């Protein structure tokens, strides 16, 4: 039996090609997650598309919890706002 994500996730997953961020967003995400890649959007897309990703929506934002990271995406513009390590 295949594992399907909940319908709430479908909107974000169907629109991964629209995912983008700003120059400042790239810098912020790299700093917050200690990333050593310039393809921050590609990195985020891969994380969001993972079967382990837990995607929730609260108001205007999607929150993706994966590998002790939280990625925040604007639900209307598909802009990656920020990403940070999950606080324990």
What are the language-model segments listed below?
Residues 1-88:
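Ribonuclease/tRNase effector modules and their secretory precursors
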